Each structure stands twice: as C-alpha cells, then as structure tokens.
Amino acid sequence: MPESKYRQQTIRAPRGTVLTAKSWLTEAPLRMLMNNLDPDVAENPHELVVYGGIGRAARNWECYDAIVDALTRLEADETLLIQSGKPVGVFKTHDNAPRVLIANSNLVPHWATWEHFNELDAKGLAMYGQMTAGSWIYIGSQGIVQGTYETFVEAGCQHYNGTLAGRWVLTAGLGGMGGAQPLAATLAGACSLTIECQQSRIDFRLRTRYVDEQAATLDDALARITRYTREGKAVSVALCANAADILPELVNRGVRPDLVTDQTSAHDPLHGYLPSGWRWEEYQKNAQSDPHGTMQAAKRSMAAHVRAMLAFSKMGVPTFDYGNNIRQMAKEMGVENAFDFPGFVPAYIRPLFCRGIGPFRWVALSGDPQDIYKTDAKVKEIVAEDKHLHHWLDMARERIHFQGLPARICWVGLEWRQKLGLAFNEMVRCGEVSAPIVIGRDHLDSGSVASPNRETEAMRDGSDAVSDWPLLNALLNTASGATWVSLHHGGGVGMGFSQHAGMVIVCDGTDEAAARIRRVLHNDPATGVMRHADAGYDLAVECAVEQGLNLPMVAATQGKG
C-alpha cells in the first residue's frame, strides 16, 4: 500500500456555527467528508477506508488535503470536480449549480473487473468509493438499519403471520453495513446470531449497542438463542468465527433458523472475505503477495457458504441474499444453482421502490443531538398518519447510537421528501435548529442504481442491467441544483456489477435553498417512480398518476391537462 494511504491522524468534523469554508454550501461537504473519516464512523480511517472493504473517502492523504483546501477556498459560483477521490478541477458555474461533482471508480465496461481496478488502484489512478464513502454522506451503521429492519419486518409478514417474536435470524458480517443487522433484527422482534471473523468489529458493535452479547463458542451461541427464543426475547448474539465454517456445521447438525441471510463484504474477495482456515493478518499479507490466489481462496469459501445457504433454503427456511453479490461469487466457483434463493429487493423491498420510498437521511451540521430530536418531531408532525414510521423514529431515538455528527434515517417516498426538506429549511431559517442540515440518501434507492444482482434484480421487463437510469438520475439532480452529486460504479456488489448515483442538498434556511429543495427532493425520488413505471409496475404507475408525473410513454400519466 502506498505510504500516502496511511496517516496516523484523527479527523472529526467541526461542530457549531463557525465556518471554515466561505459558505454553508461548501462547509457542508467539508464537514461531511471529515465526518466520513471520524474514528467513530469509519472502519479504518487512518487508511481513508470508511466501510465496505476498501470504500474510501479520498484516494490518498495528499488528495484529502487538496480536497479540504479546495473546499475552504471554493466560491459561491464555482464547482469542484472529484475524479475517483482526487480533486482535478475547479470551474466557474453559477450559484444554483452543485458545489461538488464526484465520479468514483467508473470504468469502461469491458475493463470493469476487480483485476483491472486493483491494477489502477495500485498505481494510484483509481479509488473505490463504495456508495456513500466516496460521496461523503455515510452516517455509520444507522444508514442501513431501517432498510434492514423493513426487510425483516416484511419477511415476518410474508412467512410468519406478521411477527418475528420467538424467531431467530442467522447471518454474518458486522462491518459498516452488516453491523446494522443485529439491531435491525432486535427492533423487528427477532433474536439473531451473527458470525463475524474480526473480534474488533464485534467489540465495536457491543460498545455502540448494535449487538447485545457475544458467545464464546457455537454451542454457547445456540444455547443462548434457544433460551431467548423460548422466552420470546429479542436478543442479538455475536460469534467470532468464519461463516464459511459455521454455516455448513449448522446444516450438518440439522439446526433450523427462521431466516437466513448474509452481509459479509463478499463483493470484494481480495479485501472483504476471510478464506476458511486463514487468519486476518495472513489474508492481508497474501492479498499483497498473491492477489489471484487470495481471491480464489476467498471465493472457494464463499461457495461453501452459499451451499449452506442453499441447504437452508431447501429445508424451507426463508433465505435471501442481502446485496453483497455472494451468489455471483459462488456461481463463478461452480455453484450453478447459487441464484436459487432470491435477493432482498425482489423478495421484500420492490413495492416500496415503486412509490419512490427509500433511505432518506439527514445530518445536523451543528453536531447537536437536539437538532435531530427536533427534526424527528417535525417528521411525526408532517407525516402524521404513518404510525409505522413513528414507531421507527421512537425506536431509533432509544436504541441508535449516533456515530460522528448526529444523523437520522427514515424511509419515506415521493409524497413526503420535498415536504420534509422544506420544513427542515424553515426550521433553520427561524432558528428552531442551531445550524444547517444536510439531506442525502444511500445510492441504494428506487431510481438511482442499476445492479442486476441487487436493486434491479428480476425487473418485470428484463431491464435489470440497463444503467441509463442512474445516469439520468445524476444528470437531473445536477440540473435541479443539488449541493453535491456523485456517480459511482461497483458499490455494494463489486466491480462490473453496478452503477449508481447519489445526491446531497443543504438546508441553510434561505429562499434559494427552498427553491433548490423543491426541485431536488421531488425530482430525485420521482426518477424511481419513473423507472419502475417504465418497467411496467402498476403500483409505480398509480403513484405517478397520484403525484402528477409527466411520463410521455406511460399513457395513464397523459391527458391530465
């Protein structure tokens, strides 16, 4: 690893109302970049790694310093361009243009492989941005908690008469994304057993209350799960072991969980999945000395992992891929039926996407948790009839530990995002909150991603791999005036398997911000409704009609004026 990717430095975003940059529109991306590297947020901040294997916030430390310098000097009518974590230009635009435009890890399709990307990365020519790492809107594990919670709740509705009480979830991975699983299961009323091969990750999740207990052995873990499910308690248990060993052992013992999934970093076999029988230090060393052999060893272990998941599915246990591309990796190693169990989006989430419902998130730039609690109350006031959402907000306040700048996520759709954004902007204007708020989302949203093994798996019209949609989403958010816009490749599922876009907008209390919010927070989720209506989903067409969208090739939306 080049020396410039390592620095023993602790970074935390500024708090309060004193600006380092020239305006809140440039202070916001500066603080969010720094927040991504806060040691309470990032998995490996000294190497600029935020989450998801090698998902970085900047290409190297020289690039980080240059980005910070550029943002502090950026004028109100200038736009900073970021190419794979490197600041490459500042251009005159206008005051309603994005202040930052980001493109991360995009490769011409024929060369969009981990092997080619790793060559570029080693030469200092590329950076893996994951989804929200390189787009500076990661908020820690909370960012995926509600999506995982909604998935588990829907699984309970489909398979267990609406409740997961007395049930248990078997999964693996306690990294930046997977770390949400045990808390999400608990909030959904289920016990969980999560396998994680790094003790440091278990320690972090115990400290932040995302996991309740650690078992010493597999027998100990199963005894705890048996006791808690019998008592009807929702308790999360972690076990330090390798999932490629534990899941086959559970199959051999005839153990029957109630749900099975996985959120290891299987998308990145070189950095994210420990081969069976290896120590983590050995894995890291071999990744440098023998990358091909290391990737093959990891994929062989993934194949064993997926065979066990297939065995659970054959037992009748609801089993699903949670978007890390482990099925694809197993298929490449000869597991021809790896896709016999579904991904979580077609199984549980797509009806939400049809209505533009997805991971709406916001961050208090003040650093004051009270600002988030006040916005929680505002959400309840505006979305007054959604008791399920109110329940989520109550649980989040009680159980979710803020990482870095205080933040909140809640899944809302096209009908509500603009209204909430305008309300937050008004709260800033009249001083109800102490500093501006940024609103963003995961790239995992209804109109912002093409990922045939995850978000766009099994589309009704067969358009799973069509990536025009995230490109259009990024272009429209740029035209609408988002504060920063990002376009990435490979997030979630790895090189060659996804393209996706993100946006962030600042609520600074001004009339100009309100105008931008009206455009961005309507148009962004509307692209998701558009994408699903175009694919033939009746629920999306109904939403398009209700919300007055003009979709020229969708007849139901025409002739209204």
From Swiss-Prot:
Residues annotated to bind NAD(+): 52-53, 130, 176-178, 196, 201, 242-243, 263-267, 273-274, 322, 492
Alphabetical keyword list: Cytoplasm, Histidine metabolism, Lyase, NAD
InterPro entries, alphabetized: Urocanase, Urocanase-like, Urocanase_C, Urocanase_central_sf, Urocanase_CS, Urocanase_N, Urocanase_Rossmann-like, Urocanase_sf
Cofactors required: NAD(+)
GO-annotated biological processes: L-histidine catabolic process to glutamate and formamide; L-histidine catabolic process to glutamate and formate
UniProt GO cellular component terms: cytoplasm
UniProt GO molecular function: urocanate hydratase activity
CC cofactor note: Binds 1 NAD(+) per subunit.
Enzyme Commission number(s) from the entry: 4.2.1.49
Catalytic reaction annotation: 4-imidazolone-5-propanoate = trans-urocanate + H2O
SUPFAM superfamilies cross-referenced by the UniProt entry: Urocanase
Gene3D superfamilies reported for this sequence: Urocanase like domains, Urocanase superfamily
Biological pathway: Amino-acid degradation; L-histidine degradation into L-glutamate; N-formimidoyl-L-glutamate from L-histidine: step 2/3
Subcellular locations according to the entry: Cytoplasm
Domain of life: Bacteria
Key word Mitochondrion present: no
Active site residues per record: C410
Keyword Cell wall biogenesis/degradation in record: no
Family to which this protein belongs: Belongs to the urocanase family.
Function: Catalyzes the conversion of urocanate to 4-imidazolone-5-propionate.
PANTHER family: UROCANATE HYDRATASE (PTHR12216:SF4)
Name used for this protein in its record: Urocanate hydratase
